[in-house]
């Protein structure tokens, strides 16, 4: 009689090497998607237990004093208006089938990670919408505000007819932020369809509109199709001053994976993170509205 073969050895929990490979593929798959992370400085709260953090809207002190002996008192304080910010879990589940795992282990091939990578991209896309836009009509996000819908942000109506008026629009948005004491460097955030218009040549020159706009926004031009208006339209762009003093990404748990074998011998997995945008000085943001 043959010895009964041990069932489950080839379909056991993922090895350390397989887990490292999965994590590597997750990181590589989200890099092109995470535009917001290039804009937001990070504030790490240390663990995923925080469900809320406090945000603070601040006002400036009174102006400094000029005198001969420095004895006139001008002491006051920055006024801070506090408000709670929810820190949600962004997650997407996936499955690795046991037969695919056997094929990988016996065929000398890397583990199949298409489902894992797709799940990671879904999480990254949600993160980018959360940071760059926040909750908008048609996309519920626990009322969390990103750059495009931040209460107290500046707005400037577009002169329309892009790319002809793109330079004028961006310059006007910078002016709005400068009026509130923000002097750059500024970045421009826009959707790919509006960037395409900037690749046109200015009449009677060999210069692209994109080149002239780039001269105004020294912190760079960032392209993200996660940018929407509060109503869910795609007719806006943002000019922002990059600084942790203005806004930051709160991280309780950075992008991670969790894997567990089920009763059917398959691996159930989850890509997840615990993050939220915290907008401190919304006057560092100007939304250009009504692009045409």
Predicted regions and their residues:
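Long, hydrophobic/aromatic-enriched structural stretches that serve as scaffold segments
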Residues: 37-108
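Alpha-helical scaffold segments that mediate packing/assembly in large oligomeric complexes
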Residues: 91-172
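Sequence/fold signature of self-assembling virion shell proteins
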Residues: 1-60, 199-292
């Amino acid at each position: 009689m043959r010895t009964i073969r041990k069932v489950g050895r080839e379909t056991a929990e993922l090895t350390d090497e397989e887990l490292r490979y999965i994590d590597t593929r997750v990181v590589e798959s989200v890099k092109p998607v995470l535009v917001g992370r290039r804009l937001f400085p990070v504030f790490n709260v240390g663990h995923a237990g925080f469900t809320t953090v406090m945000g603070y809207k601040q006002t400036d002190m009174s102006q400094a004093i000029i005198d001969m002996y420095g004895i006139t008192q001008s002491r006051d304080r920055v006024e801070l208006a506090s408000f709670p910010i929810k820190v949600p879990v962004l997650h997407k589940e996936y499955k690795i089938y046991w037969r695919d795992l056997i094929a990988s282990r016996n065929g000398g091939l890397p583990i199949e990670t298409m489902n894992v990578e797709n799940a990671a991209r879904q999480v990254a896309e949600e993160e980018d919408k959360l940071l760059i836009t926040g909750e908008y009509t048609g996309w519920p996000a626990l009322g969390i505000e990103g750059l495009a819908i931040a209460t107290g942000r500046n707005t400037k109506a577009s002169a329309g007819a892009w790319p002809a008026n793109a330079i004028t629009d961006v310059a006007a948005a910078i002016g709005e932020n400068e009026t509130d004491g923000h002097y750059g460097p500024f970045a421009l955030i826009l959707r790919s369809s509006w960037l395409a218009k900037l690749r046109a040549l200015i009449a009677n020159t060999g210069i692209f509109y994109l080149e002239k706009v780039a001269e105004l926004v020294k912190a760079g031009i960032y392209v993200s199709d996660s940018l929407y208006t509060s109503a869910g339209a795609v007719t806006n762009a943002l000019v922002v001053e990059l600084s942790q003093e203005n806004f930051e990404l709160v991280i309780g748990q950075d992008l991670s994976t969790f894997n567990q074998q089920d009763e059917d011998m398959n691996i159930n997995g989850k890509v997840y993170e615990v993050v939220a945008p915290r907008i401190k000085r919304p006057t560092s943001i100007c939304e250009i509205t009504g692009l045409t």
